[in-house]
Amino acid sequence: MFEKIRKILADIEDSQNEIEMLLKLANLSLGDFIEIKRGSMDMPKGVNEAFFTQLSEEVERLKELINALNKIKKGLLVF
């Protein structure tokens, strides 16, 4: 069980690093990304749709990893 938790935590860290790198390449903050995703802000001209899609997919992967970790946490703490 703990090995699975360590693997998920390592994957979360990798995903976080990938997101940070993509945000730096696009000169965006995480807040900017969220605003663009919500439609509250226009996408900058220097960021193409394919790049934004890649960033969105990585954020979705991070969300899935966090959900998996939360699921394990709930399973461990129920007794």
From Swiss-Prot:
The record's annotation in Pfam families points to: DUF2443 (PF10398)
Q: Where are the transmembrane segments?
A: none
Tree of life domain: Bacteria
The protein's name is Uncharacterized protein HP_1531
